[in-house]
Design a protein with these regions (language model features):
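C-terminal effector/catalytic modules and regulatory tails appended to multi-domain proteins
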Residues: 46-184
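Histidine/acidic-rich helix-loop-helix segments that form or flank divalent-metal centers
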Residues: 2-84
């Protein structure tokens, strides 16, 4: 938000192309960007507004951004070599492994289909992976759907989540410590 707002008044800024040089539109875009990190539900700044005679549904746009970020949780966001060799807390590693084990997420006709790919491990361990990582992924999708329901119902957006699983010998397994973490 700060970056956008500071560039609105900078005459030499190239960012003005992002909001067509219109400072009011720039402020609206900054609000949507900011919404990604705050609880905006009851904030009147996110009520519907207008721009050049058009209705702008800031709350809905902000809700869709939060949902989009939640759905952008696949393995394209993970560098497994860095993850397995980095010194970050276990809970953070587990968060990124959640992304690593999601091959893709597709949305069609209000059905969210999540394609997981886990390492080729014992059946019992695989069930633990499925249970933990499916729950974590679905939790955040359901959280967004519930939290932003007042916005999503205006566009008839609700979800059914379907999960598909496969295994691969090329997928890295969790370390013993991380595996114990997901079993707690």
């Amino acid at each position: 938000k700060y970056w956008i707002l500071s560039n609105i008044y900078n005459k030499k800024s190239e960012l003005k192309q992002a909001y067509f040089g219109d400072s009011y539109l720039g402020v609206l875009i900054a609000k949507v960007v900011e919404s990604h990190g705050i609880d905006f539900i009851d904030n009147p700044e996110y009520n519907d507004t207008s721009y050049n005679g058009l209705k702008i549904r800031l709350g809905l746009i902000s809700s869709l951004l939060c949902l989009a970020d939640t759905l952008d949780c696949d393995n394209r966001r993970v560098y497994i070599d860095k993850l397995t060799h980095s010194e970050i807390p276990d809970y953070s590693k587990i968060h990124w492994f959640k992304h690593y084990y999601v091959n893709s997420i597709l949305i069609r006709n209000n059905i969210v289909t999540i394609y997981y790919c886990f390492p080729d491990i014992s059946k019992n361990d695989l069930e633990n992976y499925k249970k933990y990582f499916t729950y974590q992924t679905e939790y955040w999708i359901n959280y967004c759907e519930t939290k932003y329901e007042k916005y999503f119902e205006t566009i008839n957006l609700n979800f059914k989540i379907v999960s598909h699983y496969e295994t691969s010998r090329e997928k890295c397994a969790l370390s013993k410590v991380n595996f114990e973490y997901i079993q707690e």
